Amino acid sequence: MASEKSHKVHPPLHFILFPFMAQGHMIPMIDIARLLAQRGATVTIVTTRYNAGRFENVLSRAMESGLPINIVHVNFPYQEFGLPEGKENIDSYDSMELMVPFFQAVNMLEDPVMKLMEEMKPRPSCIISDLLLPYTSKIARKFSIPKIVFHGTGCFNLLCMHVLRRNLEILKNLKSDKDYFLVPSFPDRVEFTKPQVPVETTASGDWKAFLDEMVEAEYTSYGVIVNTFQELEPAYVKDYTKARAGKVWSIGPVSLCNKAGADKAERGNQAAIDQDECLQWLDSKEDGSVLYVCLGSICNLPLSQLKELGLGLEKSQRSFIWVIRGWEKYNELYEWMMESGFEERIKERGLLIKGWSPQVLILSHPSVGGFLTHCGWNSTLEGITSGIPLITWPLFGDQFCNQKLVVQVLKAGVSAGVEEVMKWGEEEKIGVLVDKEGVKKAVEELMGASDDAKERRRRVKELGESAHKAVEEGGSSHSNITYLLQDIMQQVKSKN
């Protein structure tokens, strides 16, 4: 802590953090809260009671260590919008029908939050809000304080969205959803289909109104915090910073603030496996021999595809950990595993985690040599930070952009071969995109002994080392937190 004290800011700034209610958005925001508090700022996190419970243990340890972090609860108006009680996080829903009322309920938090802000002591200096909570812009305007947007994705994807929003005619002129187009004015030559990019061109009604409000709130914000580091995507950090008139702070990988084993194990939620049991299993395997498989907290693959994934892992003859989140939704998968003998056949070299996994803890273990991921930005960054090459299996959102960065630009992974977006409600119709032979082939390509595989491992190990240097004192991300604190302090002083 001695090195951090030299950077503390006095009098302390007070940051109000608004994480969106989705695991992939909340987890890095909690890490950001700890990073700011370690540098002397007071931090208040505003969320609902149910969501606060997900990171209670991690924050309790942070507070007990003396970090000035507070949590303030607001009531989630589930009844008004016909939502089930206790389902206050987007990963609790598996149908698009409830998404619009969920977002409407989230937007209704504006009034109670406004009242909270009026009573808050010390006076807030700055809001850091998730992109998906545009109402926080009104609050920032009312209290005349800067609002910084947190996206939860990297600069490659942010620049891609920025460029395409200014060239919508490219998307509108495509004759088919299967046609590829070239992203204009981009540092690298990259191509996508229209469904693969997170830029909406056909929204209507309430959903379009929300998206328009979100984009406006983003572009009128004071600046952007990004969970990335300059050495990972230098051209994209540079161009996106230029596009946002300089107010972009790359402060990642924020997951590296989790140094204690307990913090790594409980990051985001209570793990569905005992930490010691997991480590004991990993300790029994050779270095670099285990493939970690996790397709995120909102994985919506159909049963037919999950069976092929399991059979492909079995055929690869590699040791693996397979995480199946939302396990309660997969009774049929469990029946298949038992009746077909799958669980019995793989018990010596396969570990199934049925629920939330201690991902950072697993990825930082020397036995792990590969990561099959849905390419959510947190997972992508956690894999690279741990020096682990990736098999990319994107589902939706920013994940196809992240795949392109990993495979084509960074050359830190191989694609499983998925080209079609997994649309909510149409999973069964889409069916199997990668069969067991395709899974086996991707695992062999990643974990094998070819020159390409060796070069990929060398490259990603180098990126992992750069990530750790970035967050150390004097590193790019550590310095960017200093610049952020100095900037907000100047804003506070100019108003006094």
Swiss-Prot record:
CDD domains: GT1_Gtf-like. InterPro entries: UDP_glucos_trans, UDP_glycos_trans_CS. Signal peptide: none annotated. Keywords: Glycosyltransferase, Transferase. This is UDP-glycosyltransferase 73C4. It comes from Arabidopsis thaliana. It is an enzyme of class 2 (transferase). PANTHER family: GLYCOSYLTRANSFERASE (PTHR48047), UDP-GLYCOSYLTRANSFERASE 73C3-RELATED (PTHR48047:SF229). It comes from the Eukaryota. The gene is UGT73C4. Belongs to the UDP-glycosyltransferase family. UDP-alpha-D-glucose binds at residues 297, 357-359, 374-382, 396-399. Residues 450-475 are annotated as: Disordered. One of its GO terms (molecular function) is UDP-glycosyltransferase activity. Residues 451-472 have a biased composition (Basic and acidic residues). Its EC number is 2.4.1.-.
